[in-house]
Amino acid sequence: MGIEEIRRYLPHRYPFLLIDRIIALETQNYIHALKNVTANEPFFQGHFPNKAVMPGVLVVEAMAQAAGILGVKSAKAAAGLPDEPEEDGIYFFVGIDKARFRKTVVPGDQLILEVKLLRSRRGIWSFDARATVDDAVVCTAEIMCTSAGKGAA
């Protein structure tokens, strides 16, 4: 899935859209996405000017954005609905557990986001998320999301 289709599923835009491409996706199971981290990212101006490091919270946000796409597509599949995003639907990041930051992410890295659906209960979707660079784990977390909007899944 390319950037144009990603924009149909996520309301985020520059500079907060943190996914460049979906590599693999199996609804109700997993998603693999990537973010090419460049020296031109606006957050590097202040984090840190002499030693650029991607803020850990943005690595978590990138994982949550991947989870959002997986959640919307999975909810549609579970309900037997067409695989189309809702015009007024939005997916909210509502919780994080067990977050661990293991390595830094720097300009030139390709961040691979691997998110697996754990469960869905009472409108809350739980995901196991992992971010890697060159096969080395940089961040892990359990992420919770929910959807809202008239036509939300």
Swiss-Prot record:
SUPFAM superfamilies, alphabetized: Thioesterase/thiol ester dehydrase-isomerase
The keyword Disulfide bond appears for this protein: no
Catalytic residues identified in the record: 47
Record localization: Cytoplasm
Key word Lipid metabolism present: yes
Residues passing through the membrane, by range: none
Any one annotated GO CC term: cytoplasm
Catalytic activity entry: a (3R)-hydroxyacyl-[ACP] = a (2E)-enoyl-[ACP] + H2O
Principal subcellular localisation of the protein: cytoplasm
GO biological process: fatty acid biosynthetic process; lipid A biosynthetic process
Record CDD domains: FabZ
Keywords: Cytoplasm, Lipid A biosynthesis, Lipid biosynthesis, Lipid metabolism, Lyase
EC number: 4.2.1.59
GO molecular function: (3R)-hydroxyacyl-[acyl-carrier-protein] dehydratase activity
Pfam family for this entry, one: FabA
Similarity section: Belongs to the thioester dehydratase family. FabZ subfamily.
Function, in words: Involved in unsaturated fatty acids biosynthesis. Catalyzes the dehydration of short chain beta-hydroxyacyl-ACPs and long chain saturated and unsaturated beta-hydroxyacyl-ACPs.
Protein name, UniProt field: 3-hydroxyacyl-[acyl-carrier-protein] dehydratase FabZ
Lineage: Bacteria, Pseudomonadati, Pseudomonadota, Gammaproteobacteria, Cardiobacteriales
